[in-house]
Amino acid sequence: MSQAAVETNNMPSINVAPVLSLIEKNAPEGKENRQLPDSSIEALREQGFFRMLLPKKYGGYECTPQEFFRSAIDIAERDMSTAWAGGIIAVHAYQLAIMPPQAAEEVYADTPDTLISSSYNPAGAKVKTVDGGFELSGRWGWSSGSGHCSWTLLGGVITDHPDGIHYRTFLLPRSDYEIEETWFPMGLHATGSNDIVIDEPVFVPEHRTHIQMDGFNCVHHQENPMYSIPWAQLFIRVVSSPSIGAAKH
């Protein structure tokens, strides 16, 4: 267990306070380079921030959402971009926990500190149903923190499936996609929210997909009832927490 994790009533407590001064110090560098400094990511990783919502069986801490959001707000008081990109990366551990177990087993096979980005907008996605899974290509915008991540979650609408038209999230390793530098914003400069591009279709097996309605209906594969919270409720709060922290600054 990280030195930042302390057992409280058999539940770990993550303390991000020791890295807040570094995050604040790094803010100008992140703004200039339009992505979070490596040292900020590594500091959050060492404090266990990215493992807060990850199941214990994969090396995580299974912290409560309340504790996770409090940490995100504390970070945002020092730098909103770090809370935005870092929080989005961290919350994906929860989505992996409610996907088919084989997906998490692959992602966290080598380390529980694997980082995952996302872009859920399906507008630029092309999806084809094939034997055992799907072929995916297209372009997805605003993938915050993607330059620090070795996996990504991408949204797509399936129109040729026996179950009818529906939305899924597709989990892909870094070798399956490119990151195109498109992030030249007026705010949240350091989030590095660049485009994810897949020019030639890549295969995504069925177990590395997440049906949207499963997330809404609280379908999960964990013993902890915390994972019954609908996925969307976690995500909308992780992107609103930075505003609360910034307002407190």
Task: Please identify what each model-predicted range represents.
Residues M1-S21:
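Basic/polar N-terminal segments that are highly enriched at the extreme N-terminus
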Residues N9, S13, R34, D38, ...:
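Amphipathic, non-membrane alpha-helical segments in soluble helical-bundle scaffolds
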Residues S21-P28:
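Short, basic, glycine/proline-bearing loop/turn elements
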Residues L36-E46, R51-C149:
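Glycine-rich flavin
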Residues L115-S118, P185-H189:
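Short Gly/Pro-enriched turn/cap motifs at secondary-structure boundaries
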Residues A123-A125, G132-F134, S150-L154, H166-R168, ...:
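Generic beta-strand structural signal
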Residues R139-Y177, E181-T182:
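DPxDG-like acidic metal-binding loop motif
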Residues G187, S193-H249:
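Glycine-rich beta->alpha junctions and the first turn(s) of the following alpha-helix
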